[in-house]
């Protein structure tokens, strides 16, 4: 997926451990995050806020977890053409459940109905690639279901 990024896109990469390279992209900004409170570290949420000030074309985030799940979903819904993120899940479809539970655990997520969170996820995320040991195991892509979520026909 990352190799398909156009060389002239503004790409912001948010990582807790450096794993991602996009050498073919001219304007790539790397931001490191970690456990907030440690000297020299900012939280993933702080990194996302800083990222949004840079007018990203694409936002790549590794290890989506904690409160950052809600912030990342909001970032993807602000008119950017897309993003790539990683999280731990048991399958491609289970990634939606995992992210949904992460969002539900946030202060804002606790006020939202889980079905609304899931509808937002399915209407925002186009493709999920499930990998094990750096090999593709499964790909989720269901544009018809996405359109049902977008149109509210579920």
Question: At which residue positions do the language-model features occur?
Answer:
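Switch/coupling sub-region of P-loop NTPases
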Residues: 3-122
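Conserved P-loop NTPase
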Residues: 119-154
